[in-house]
C-alpha cells in the first residue's frame, strides 16, 4: 500500500541547474524513475543535486540506492599510436563522467595471456595533462571462450578512454564488440498520470534536499511501483 505523502514540496527556481530532462508519467501511483546515462553522469556522485519539479514546485522523493548495472556500446577505434608490442584502442563514451564499473570485450582467440590497462588523459592545474590509470586486468584463456573483463577502480572524468593490450611477442588479439557497464540508481515518488514533470541536475554547490518523504522511505521503497520514463535532455 502506498504511504500518504504530499505530492508537492517547496517552490524552486531551477536557474542554477545545468541540465534538465522531461519525465513522462504514464500511470498514477508510486513511481520509479531510473537515472539515464546522461543523468547519472551529469549529477553529483552523491545525487544531492537531483530535483524533480512540477509547476515550479519540488516533488518529494526518496532514493533507491540499490545499484543497477546497464550496458552501452561505445564508439571504438584501433590505433597504432604506440606501435611495437602494444595494441591501443580509443574508446569514446556517450557522455562525460559516466560511472563505468567495467569494460566487456569479445575475442575469438582461445589461448593467450595478456596484460591490459585502461587510462584517460586528465587536466592537472599548473601541470597540463597527465595520463591516469583507471583500471586493468590480466587476461588468461586456456582453450575456453570466457568473457574478457576490465574492472575500473576509478570512474572516468571525461568521455575518452584508452585501452592498451601488451601483446608481448604474440600476434595482436582480434578484439570486438566492446561494451561499457555503468552503475545507476532510481528515484521513488508519487505522481498522477500525465503530470508535467522535469528532472534537474548539475548543480555542484547546492545542498541535498530534505523532504518529509524520508519519514516513509521504507514504505515507498516497498510499495508496488510503476516505471516513469526519463526523456533525453
Label each region the model flagged.
Residues 1-233:
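Extended non-catalytic domains of envelope/secretory-pathway proteins
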Amino acid at each position: 500500500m502506498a504511504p500518504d505523502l504530499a505530492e508537492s514540496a517547496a517552490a524552486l527556481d531551477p536557474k542554477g541547474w545545468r541540465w534538465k530532462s522531461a519525465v513522462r508519467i504514464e500511470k498514477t501511483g508510486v513511481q520509479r524513475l531510473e537515472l539515464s546515462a546522461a543523468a547519472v553522469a551529469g549529477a553529483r556522485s552523491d545525487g544531492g543535486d537531483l530535483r524533480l519539479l512540477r509547476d515550479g514546485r519540488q516533488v518529494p522523493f526518496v532514493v533507491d540506492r540499490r545499484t543497477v548495472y546497464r550496458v552501452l556500446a561505445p564508439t571504438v577505434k584501433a590505433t597504432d599510436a604506440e606501435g611495437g608490442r602494444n595494441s591501443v584502442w580509443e574508446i569514446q563514451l556517450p557522455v562525460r563522467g559516466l560511472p563505468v564499473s567495467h569494460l566487456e570485450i569479445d575475442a575469438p582467440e582461445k589461448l593467450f595471456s595478456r596484460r591490459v590497462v585502461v587510462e584517460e588523459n586528465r587536466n592537472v592545474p599548473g601541470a597540463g595533462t597527465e595520463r591516469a590509470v583507471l583500471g586493468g586486468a590480466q587476461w588468461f584463456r586456456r582453450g575456453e571462450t570466457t568473457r574478457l573483463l576490465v574492472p575500473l577502480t576509478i570512474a572516468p572524468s571525461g568521455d575518452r578512454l584508452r585501452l592498451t593490450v601488451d601483446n608481448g611477442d604474440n600476434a595482436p588479439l582480434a578484439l570486438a564488440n566492446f561494451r561499457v557497464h555503468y552503475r545507476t540508481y532510481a528515484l521513488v515518488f508519487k505522481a498522477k498520470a500525465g503530470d508535467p514533470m522535469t528532472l534537474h541536475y548539475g548543480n555542484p554547490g547546492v545542498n541535498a534536499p530534505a523532504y518529509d518523504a524520508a519519514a516513509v522511505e521504507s514504505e515507498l521503497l516497498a510499495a508496488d511501483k510503476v516505471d516513469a520514463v526519463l526523456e533525453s535532455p
